[in-house]
Amino acid sequence: MKKPFYKVLYVQVIFAIVVGVLLGHLYPSLAVDMKPLGDGFIKLIKMVIGPIIFCTVVTGIAGMQDMKKVGRVGGKALLYFEIVSTFALVLGLAATHILRPGVGFNIDPATLNGKEVASYAAKAHGQSTVDFLMHIIPNTMIDAFAQGEILQILLIALLFGSVLAHLGERGRVVTDFIDGITRVLFGIVHIVTKLAPVGAFGAMAFTIGKYGVGSLVPLLKLIGTFYLTSVVFVLVVLGAIARFTGFSIVRFVGYIKEELLIVLGTSSSEAALPQLMEKLEKAGCSRSVVGLVVPTGYSFNLDGTNIYMTMAVLFIAQATNIELTWMQQLTLLAVAMLTSKGASGVTGAGFITLAATLAVVPTIPLSGMVLILGIDRFMSECRALTNIVGNGVATVVVSAWEKELDRAKLHAALSGNGKAAAGEAARV
């Protein structure tokens, strides 16, 4: 029997977002007080992200017969991330050149007050490439889980899973125990997900109440350019990759619509990470590939953040009438390819990454970030949405490359018939 429409999660989330926008617009002071609802939901999700990643990766690797496969999957994923990330960076640059959202502002850089962005600049300067790599190694195993550091947890899980795979049957008891814990954790996620409408309402009410719809008007062209470019990236770039792999990007987006609406309401792609991993497994991707690609992608495959970075830098240059040579723009691309790897799926990380990029391109004043500080919160939704779609597509693609994609289950899931028997599915 089909659920009444008002009991469907994505309908509830849409309604919550609309109510949040209305409350923020009509009663801003009250709406700002709703912030704990959004923060609380994200904290509940983040509470289980670390353990889920650990358990999923460990059981996936422990079940692999060939340990060389772990390195092969990781290598293919990183190669895919670099290629697609470069496309995203170039597309952001090209779209800003064509649509020129910053032209006409004629702002004197000397009049900009950089104090408002000083904290972001300080965070950006605080970590070099070596620091980033060293940060992947945790001080202790417990510390990695306590701090919720995804890459550190991933490293521990890789080592743990590798040892279990080497032990074989001697490690079967531990593997089965961790597999049971995984089921419990996903059960917790199902319970927490029911609170998604509350979280989306609180986060959206706070955003509109604090920043106001009026703050969007002067920079609507930049916002429109960014959203349009992100849509083009998903439909054209990711769409072409999806078609080549054998599935429809439109149907895939429809398949993860609940996760996308949670991200839209919270502006954090991490808020939907556990649900996305579960959905990808149900769509025919092997657990081992999902466990390796999705967590890694949250640091190395942020397509929306990549588009935003090159677009924001060029917008500031246009708004302050600074001409960038082609060599400077190529330098910008190279720098952005490195700095973007330090971004995570948490709200606000994109702005810190932008500060890191500008710090290495001194031609453009760091104080220019103040021009987009007020609208960054509204652009973060689009960044997070593009990021999660990009990571989902990446997982399906790498699964196909590894011949670990159950195409029958994939097509059944994307067509809305998720009850296809896994045993009838053909491995490709």
Swiss-Prot record:
GO terms for cellular component: plasma membrane. Keywords: Cell inner membrane, Cell membrane, Membrane, Symport, Transmembrane, Transmembrane helix, Transport. Its main location: membrane. InterPro entries: C4_dicarb_transport (IPR023954), Na-dicarboxylate_symporter (IPR001991), Na-dicarboxylate_symporter_CS (IPR018107), Na:dicarbo_symporter_sf (IPR036458). It comes from the Bacteria. The chain crosses the membrane at residues 8-28, 44-64, 78-98, 148-168, 184-204, 222-242, 307-327, 355-375. One of its GO terms (biological process) is L-aspartate transmembrane transport. It is a multi-pass membrane protein. It is found in: Cell inner membrane. Pfam families: SDF. GO terms for molecular function: fumarate transmembrane transporter activity; malate:proton symporter activity; succinate transmembrane transporter activity. PANTHER family: AEROBIC C4-DICARBOXYLATE TRANSPORT PROTEIN, PROTON/GLUTAMATE-ASPARTATE SYMPORTER. Responsible for the transport of dicarboxylates such as succinate, fumarate, and malate from the periplasm across the membrane. NCBIfam families: PRK01663.1 (NF002461), PRK13027.1 (NF009587). Belongs to the dicarboxylate/amino acid:cation symporter (DAACS) (TC 2.A.23) family. This is C4-dicarboxylate transport protein.
